[in-house]
Amino acid sequence: MKTTYYIPLLMSLLILLTPQSFAMDNIASELPLYSKIYDDERDPFKDAVAAIALAQKTQRNVLIEIGGNWCSWCHKMDAFLAKNPDVYQALHNKYVLLKVSVSDVNENEAFMKSLPPVLGYPHMYVSTNSGKMMLSKDTAELLEGDYYSKNAWLTFLDQWQYDKNAQNLLNMKTE
């Protein structure tokens, strides 16, 4: 009888302790604070300099995510990434994430004026590791219905990664 209780418990533990969950924990523990949270008190200019330096060191692009703790879609996006470890890993393996808070407390006006207009929240920008802006992206484009799409996310992350900068920059010149 005791064996029947141990089998479901063992199966549950095996599911929870997958290599992907370990990888997510390892990635999360190594992320700088500006990649983890929206904070009204952070200086986005200093964080951007640090993000660009890290991107140069690791040959990644910078993904700037504009939002805030008040933003329900920002929370949905974080939940989506937590539930999809392959997307989470692709994001952090290919990009340095810079979360910039905009709120009633701190609109970060000076920083926001340096970027193309925000179309909604969360809003994302991709820059090279030298700071050249390549893309302004409404995250609604990553939705299928009312949910973020795993396929749309993986396609987006693949298309704008560091290894494709030369082609993306060339395409920008011809548009």
Tell me what each language-model feature is.
Residues 42-45, 87-107:
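Thiol-based oxidoreductase modules, predominantly thioredoxin-like and allied folds used
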